[in-house]
Swiss-Prot record:
GO terms for biological process: queuosine biosynthetic process; tRNA wobble guanine modification. Keywords: Cytoplasm, Queuosine biosynthesis, S-adenosyl-L-methionine, Transferase. GO terms for cellular component: cytoplasm. The gene is queA. Monomer. SUPFAM superfamilies: QueA-like (SSF111337). This is S-adenosylmethionine:tRNA ribosyltransferase-isomerase. Its EC number is 2.4.99.17. It comes from Sulfurimonas denitrificans (strain ATCC 33889 / DSM 1251) (Thiomicrospira denitrificans (strain ATCC 33889 / DSM 1251)). It holds the Pfam family Queuosine_synth. Belongs to the QueA family.
Amino acid sequence: MSSSELLTSSYDFTLPEELIATQPANPRDSAKLLVYDRASDEISHVHFYDFEKFIPKNCALIFNDTKVIKARLFGQKESGGKIELLINRALDAHNIHVFTRGKVKIGTKISFGLELFAKIIELLEDGSRVVNFYKNDSILRFEEILPIIDKIGHIPLPPYIQREDNKDDEIEYQSVFAKEEGAVAAPTASLHFTKEQHERVCTKFTHAYITLHVGSGTFKPVECEKILEHTMHSEYYDISDRAKELLDSKVSILSVGTTSTRTIEFYARNKEHQRGEANLFLHPKNKPLRVDHILTNFHLPKSTLLMLVASFVGVDKAQELYKIAIEKEYRFYSYGDAMLIL
């Protein structure tokens, strides 16, 4: 391994702004798909509706069934000042980690309508906050908040999509098999599946679901030059019994997305824990142990997601594939095109 693989600057690249996808492919499976076969070093340029043709025989697919919540809320302080709040994750039953746009201090009360309000209970060093939510002065559990914010909240589009969310995003920024509420970012490789294609794949191939509630940390770039000094964010995961059975067997695994991959690989290193908090950082010096193939989108420069891709192919090959994708005008990021690494 070259020392450059451990430098954040090695994962930088220049992306033309017009290749940042701000709208999804329509239909979903019309997105382009770059297929890279490591054994033959061959690259194929197809569309996602061709995905099934490239799935290796006797391979099991693992999907992330997390569901994006309407985590972006607009409220008002008692002083009358407006404030934006982004739910990041539940720390426990009542304490919710959030980001706020606007100054708040401990004790600040923020009203959102429908008798829902939040109270700031802790200010964290990174500028984020911990809050409790209430309705009619009764403190709410996280699962009690969800049906309320589903009525008044907004889909939290990624920061690089420079537009307001709309009704279409409530459908498009969600996989067709999303089930377990809790994510504030979509597992984007999953977005390419239509309902029909997902059903066909699941009929033809062994499969299972894990849950990883994707947090906003997924968009955070690595800011230190030595990647081994980066502190990885933590997210809640749950390995279903069926997924555990497959992962504990010898079957070849195709992971749908980086979130499924992080979950599978965390479990491979911590088999005594079927659910809990995962904070695994995959990179060329910490390669996958259990995942054989990965379906993924094209990611941000200097991101842990690009470093995860490099854990499969190395940083030089990752940069080569990304250069080809840019030349071929693949669309990047959450609503963009896909890559399958075999």
